[in-house]
């Protein structure tokens, strides 16, 4: 697992510990099986103690707490993150530009992990170019398009590895990158220079290198935006968008997803595109059972089955969703459709979303077994052991203010100049920034959309 690599724990120790507690496979939370201890071997010999049961780490949680373990929510501060964990037992957080400085300065993620009942998923979207949350501290990183035009795949892998090491030092575990979108849009379009190339083969080559670099650093990459956003009719931050029909996507936009679907220790993010021939006109891919089946099975576009966790794009701040669905309904519909982790950019609405999902389970619309499978997938990338009494490998036990030393660069401005870019990663001109360093969208933002935290 990538989380084991991230924490540099000895595999032998983990395997031995699991063997000692008799854990051979994960049991669903509601179906954990007990194992009987052996009897005495003869007169005067004490009976062997019972072997500890292999209970899921989620077995002692209420249904509501287990549902909350699937949510990934954006936080506005470390205090906001602590409230989400303490009040709702949230399993994942997303940190945007406004929180990165606090994390770097105060080491808040190690403290946050210490209060969580299980290792948290800590995510960010660090693509490079105009989608870079850590640039003021780690220096600039080129956009995907610039990297593909100026660097070899080996150089891109090394650049991503260095970026991943900085993220790991902060305590980040998941990066919503790279983009697998195939696009020839102008640089500042919604995808634009976030795409490596208009050539699917080149996108595959460079996205493979970028994701390998993140994995080298112990960061879980999440490919996006399935089934392809590169030829969309607009920006899903501001309106419903469509892409070409499925038969056209299969031969072009879906090729990188097909080539990389079998990459171990990775996730996928579904976008909010409407796809003729797949999703219909009434809902985006992120809430379409057909879109999740396409990704999971792989048969419909010539890919292997995808076994990793599936995230949604932001469900609260993007109007392709929020204009038609309330947050509680969007979260519930996404889980019913097949998402493992609904993602949204604020801690608002957690309670209402939990109420809605609980109601769906109570009404038989959402099966508990379906949630158990999602919990198992999310536990895998969070480093949660299969057995409740196994070693909790994901928690940063004994960490200082940060999980690992950070090669900090001073932020630009009065505090000092920004660190120069690595020679292997030539910098590009910085895009104009909105409030809190938000990357600039392709059209003026609506006032209700809090762009600084958006997972792009």
What are these language model-derived features?
Residues 75-86, 156-164, 250-256, 326-332:
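Short, acidic/polar
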Residues 61, 65-116:
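N-terminal carbohydrate-binding/catalytic regions of secreted carbohydrate-active enzymes
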Residues 62, 103-110, 205-365:
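Second-shell residues forming the walls of enzyme active-site clefts
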Residues 68-75, 91-95, 120-126, 174-178, ...:
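Hydrophobic faces of well-ordered beta-strands that scaffold small-molecule active sites
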Residues 113-139, 156-183, 203-227:
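Glycine-rich, aromatic-flanked loop segments that form ligand/cofactor-binding clefts
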Residues 2-7, 17, 23-84, 321-421, ...:
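Preference for extracellular/luminal or secreted protein segments
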Residues 12-22, 125:
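Bacterial N-terminal signal peptides
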Residues 44, 74, 92-100, 144-158, ...:
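Second-shell loop/turn segments in exported
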């Amino acid at each position: 697992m990538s989380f084991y690599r991230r924490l540099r724990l000895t595999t032998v120790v983990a395997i031995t510990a699991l063997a000692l507690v008799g854990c051979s496979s994960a049991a669903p939370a509601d179906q954990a099986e007990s194992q009987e201890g052996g009897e005495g071997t003869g007169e005067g010999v004490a009976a062997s103690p019972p072997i500890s049961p292999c209970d899921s780490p989620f077995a002692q949680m209420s249904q509501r707490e287990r549902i909350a373990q699937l949510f990934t929510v954006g936080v506005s501060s470390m205090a906001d993150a602590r409230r989400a964990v303490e009040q709702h037992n949230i399993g994942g957080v997303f940190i945007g530009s406004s929180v990165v400085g606090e994390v770097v300065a105060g080491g808040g993620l190690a403290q946050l992990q210490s209060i969580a009942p299980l290792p948290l998923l800590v995510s960010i979207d660090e693509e490079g170019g105009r989608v870079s949350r850590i640039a003021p501290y780690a220096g600039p990183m080129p956009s995907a398009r610039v990297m593909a035009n100026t660097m070899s795949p080996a150089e891109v892998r090394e650049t991503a590895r260095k970026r991943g090491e900085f993220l790991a030092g902060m305590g980040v575990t998941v990066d919503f990158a790279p983009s697998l979108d195939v696009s020839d849009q102008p640089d500042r379009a919604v995808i634009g220079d976030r795409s490596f190339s208009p050539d699917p083969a080149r996108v595959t080559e460079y996205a493979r290198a970028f994701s390998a670099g993140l994995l080298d650093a112990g960061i879980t990459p999440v490919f996006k935006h399935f089934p392809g956003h590169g030829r969309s009719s607009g920006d899903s931050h501001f309106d419903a968008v469509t892409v070409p029909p499925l038969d056209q996507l299969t031969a072009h936009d879906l090729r990188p997803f097909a080539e990389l679907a079998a990459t171990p220790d990775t996730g996928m993010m579904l976008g909010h595109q409407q796809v003729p021939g797949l999703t219909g006109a009434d809902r985006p891919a992120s809430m379409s059972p057909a879109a999740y089946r396409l990704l999971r099975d792989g048969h419909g576009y010539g890919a292997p089955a995808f076994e990793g966790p599936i995230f949604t794009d932001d469900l609260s701040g993007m109007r392709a969703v929020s204009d038609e669905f309330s947050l509680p309904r969007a979260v519930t519909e996404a889980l019913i459709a097949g998402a493992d982790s609904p993602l949204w950019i604020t801690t608002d609405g957690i309670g209402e979303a939990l109420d809605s999902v609980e109601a769906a389970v109570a009404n038989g619309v959402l099966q508990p077994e379906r949630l158990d499978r999602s919990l198992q997938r999310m536990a895998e990338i969070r480093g949660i052991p299969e057995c409740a009494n196994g070693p909790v490998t994901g928690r940063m036990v004994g960490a200082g203010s940060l999980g690992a030393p950070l090669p900090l660069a001073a932020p630009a401005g009065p505090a000092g100049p920004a660190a120069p870019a690595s020679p292997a990663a030539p910098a590009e001109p910085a895009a104009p920034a909105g409030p809190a360093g938000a990357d600039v969208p392709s059209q003026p933002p609506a006032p209700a959309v809090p762009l600084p935290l958006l997972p792009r």
